[in-house]
Structure formats: structure tokens, C-alpha cells
Design a protein with these regions (language model features):
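Hydrophobic, aromatic-lined core segments that form the binding pocket/scaffold
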Residues: 97-210, 214
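An amphipathic, hydrophobic-aromatic interaction surface with interspersed Lys/Arg
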Residues: 1-85, 93, 166-262
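Long, intrinsically disordered, low-complexity Ser/Thr/Pro-rich regulatory/activation regions
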Residues: 265-284
């Protein structure tokens, strides 16, 4: 299947200029991955006047964040080595398991309620929001590889294109690459997995009753509105693409750091010889 996704074997690099264009990410001639406006995110939960829009949005982008390293415990429980699988394979495993659980708990429901529950599951909502397709399914190709399809077999995603999408999701939402440990051997790897298992258990107990909204989007909007040069206001900020919001805050932070450092240099508190002004510059 010919796609428009251009990938790099080492890393799915997407030019910063493209991110700033606000364009959707092209997948095929018929399908693109949405680069949402802030208003698009607000509109996710129109039923409740946007009250839960932010929570739902971050649940939806989490659907596409399936780094095997992050899911090492989940994979280990299935007898899968996280170093030998791909993000797309993890996505497929999570989707299948999620749908099986959803179907099982939905069995006592009437047909109408069952249909609504299936239609509104987080995977289908995410693909409807970002791709504009109501549902999708996993197709096993003759070579054993999996493909995501929609409608009557139209191509949506495969292993390579999924990496492209995952990179786009992380870039436009300002999600950094997490730190990781590279174990020397299988013994060290198993220790790492068990340590992660314990961390997840403690995290689950600690946050069991914690339903506090982190308000990340709200904090980003507040920051860009009141610390930028005045171009972003309460009256136009909803028309920013999500990457503009993230990039604007990062650029403002660099500018403030540059100004504060230069004040330190001019006042004699910082030795100019010990800093790299080119790397420090806010326009880099």
C-alpha cells in the first residue's frame, strides 16, 4: 500500500516547519491525522459543555503512545520480550484486550446500550477524532504482518506508518522522550521488569482514589496567554493549533532564560567564558 508517510529508520523525524504549518499529517490520499486546534479539543465533550474535554483528549492521545519499554510488564505477562516487539504490535495487543473486556462486561446489556458502549469506546473515539473514521479493525496479511483497516478494507495504519503517527502525537503535544535503562543481559532485564512491576503497583495504590484533573491544557493556555508578547489573547487562543501552544511556551521559556542569563553576565554574577551563548540563544 502506497502511503504519504515518510519515515527514517533511526527516528521518525517530522520537520519543525511542518509542525508549525498546522497541517494535518498525511497518511494516504484519503486519510490524514488531525492536528487539532484548541477549539477542537474544547468541542470534544459538547454534551457537558467541555467539562471533560481535556481528560478525554489526553486519554485519546494515550491510545497512540505504545512504546514497548513503557509496557514491559504488560508484555512480560504475555511472554513477550519488550525489546523484540514494536509500538504497533503493542497497540494491537492493547486494543484486542480492551475490546474483549468491553464485550464481556457489555453482554448483560440490551442491544442499543451495547451498540452505544462499543461505539463510544476510547479507541473508536480517538480514531473518529483524529482520522475521521468511525471504526477500524485489524487485518492479518498473508506475510503474517498486521494492518489496520477501515470501511471495506481501506488501508489505515501498519507498523511503519504507526511510528510516524506516534512521533507526530508526541511532537505536537510536547511529550518528551522518557529516560530508559538499557540492561546488559537477560538477568538485568528481568530485574528491570520486576522493579517496574513494583513501581506500577505502588503508583496504582497511591493514585487509587486520586481523580484530580492535572489541568495541563488549562495551564498551557494560561501560560501562553499571560507571558507571551501579547499576540495571544483570551479572544484568539482557541484558534491555536496544539503545537503552537506547546512551541510558544517552550520559546518563551528559552527567551526568559536567555534574558536572565544575560542579566547575570552584565551584572558580573555569571562568567561569560563559561557559557555557550550560541546554544543559549532563545532563537535556537
Amino acid at each position: 500500500m502506497q502511503t504519504l508517510a515518510q519515515t527514517n529508520n533511526e527516528k521518525e523525524l517530522i520537520p519543525k516547519s511542518f509542525l508549525q504549518s498546522g497541517n494535518d499529517l498525511p497518511i494516504t490520499n484519503e486519510i490524514a491525522f488531525k492536528h487539532p486546534l484548541v477549539q477542537d479539543i474544547f468541542d470534544i465533550d459538547k454534551e457537558h459543555l467541555g467539562l471533560y474535554s481535556e481528560d478525554i483528549y489526553y486519554q485519546m492521545i494515550n491510545v497512540f503512545l505504545t512504546d514497548p519499554y513503557t509496557y514491559m510488564v504488560f508484555l512480560d505477562d504475555k511472554g513477550i520480550d519488550y525489546e523484540s516487539t514494536t509500538p504497533f504490535e503493542v497497540f494491537c495487543l492493547l486494543f484486542v484486550e480492551y475490546m474483549e473486556k468491553l464485550i464481556n462486561i457489555s453482554k448483560p446489556l440490551e442491544d442499543d446500550s451495547f451498540g452505544i458502549l462499543i461505539k463510544n469506546n476510547i479507541y473508536f473515539r480517538a480514531f473518529s477524532f483524529f482520522f475521521g473514521v468511525d471504526s477500524f479493525y485489524i487485518k492479518q496479511e498473508q506475510d503474517g504482518k498486521k494492518t489496520l483497516c477501515y470501511d471495506d478494507g481501506k488501508f489505515l495504519l501498519n507498523d511503519d506508518v504507526y511510528n510516524y503517527v506516534m512521533e507526530f502525537v508526541k511532537r505536537i503535544n510536547g511529550i518528551p522522550e522518557g529516560e530508559r535503562i538499557n540492561p546488559e543481559d537477560e538477568w538485568a532485564k528481568q530485574i528491570l521488569i520486576e522493579d517496574e512491576r513494583e513501581r506500577l503497583k505502588k503508583h496504582a495504590l497511591k493514585h487509587k482514589d486520586d481523580e484530580t484533573n492535572t489541568n495541563r491544557l488549562g495551564n498551557l493556555l494560561s501560560t501562553i496567554t499571560w507571558t507571551c508578547n501579547g499576540g495571544v489573547t483570551p479572544f484568539n487562543r482557541n484558534q491555536l493549533h496544539i503545537y503552537d501552544l506547546v512551541d510558544g511556551i517552550e520559546r518563551t521559556s528559552k527567551l526568559l532564560n536567555y534574558k536572565n542569563t544575560m542579566i547575570g553576565v552584565y551584572s558580573g554574577c555569571i562568567d561569560k567564558k563559561k557559557i555557550n551563548l550560541n546554544e543559549l540563544h532563545w532563537a535556537k
